[in-house]
A protein has these predicted regions:
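Terminal transmembrane helix and immediately flanking juxtamembrane interfaces
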Residues: 1-211
């Protein structure tokens, strides 16, 4: 990375572009500690969203300027580089899409699932990370504001859609709506239980009923 200087400004830029990796690491560690598959479902959703984002990249074909910072190559997805022309597509922004997807996927379930408590500090933190990412990418010429806006739009729509898919499939336990709220108590309506009773006399079955 030519001309790189270790400074507070460069560290801020570097951490801003590393935000997607930090989010993945945090959610993976959360799943390891809690021994659940939530991070796997989340990563599957981000993979689908990335494919949709790459589709729009090839549709728009907005290329990154030659004087873009080397920091822009920290978070590079396959198929986002035009190998024939050696050009990198920059819209919709992949990092903005990723953070926005995470924001929607975590925030929306909090509003529509018990205990219906939104973790305001978490939502504000993710929103702040998104703003920092947009500013850092623009300053480093990784993309323009339109690319960041489109990435944010694609990410939020895909995050909401992925939540809807998981929620409607009956696997609400794989969502994050209760993990990051202050109240961990969740009440659900108990499911019906059935009992099968068999009546025998002298070793012969007289009656069988289900209660």
């Amino acid at each position: 990375m030519a001309g790189f200087e270790f400074s507070a400004t460069n560290l801020f830029k570097f951490l801003g572009l590393l935000t997607p990796f930090l989010i993945i690491f945090f959610l993976l560690m959360s799943s390891v500690i809690n021994q659940d598959l939530k991070a796997l479902i989340y990563l599957l959703g981000t993979s689908v969203a990335s494919l949709v984002n790459i589709f729009f990249m090839y549709l728009i074909k907005s290329t990154r300027p030659d004087d873009a910072s080397p920091f822009c190559n920290v978070f590079t997805f396959p198929f986002t580089v035009n190998s024939e022309a050696n050009e990198r597509y920059d819209a919709p922004s992949m990092t903005s899409m990723f953070i926005s997807f995470t924001l929607a996927y975590i925030w929306i379930p909090m509003m529509f699932n018990p205990p219906n408590t939104v973790n305001i500090p978490l939502v504000l933190t993710l929103s702040a990370l998104l703003v920092i990412d947009i500013i850092a990418q623009h300053n480093q010429k990784c993309t323009n504001f339109l690319g960041s806006f489109l990435g944010t739009l694609v990410g939020f729509v895909m995050g909401a859609a992925w939540y809807g898919l998981v929620n409607s499939s009956g696997y609400q336990s794989l969502l994050y709506y209760s993990d990051f709220t202050g109240n961990k108590t969740i009440c659900r309506r108990p499911q019906k239980e059935y009992f099968k009773c068999d009546v025998y006399k002298n070793g012969k079955l007289l009656q069988s009923s289900r209660l």
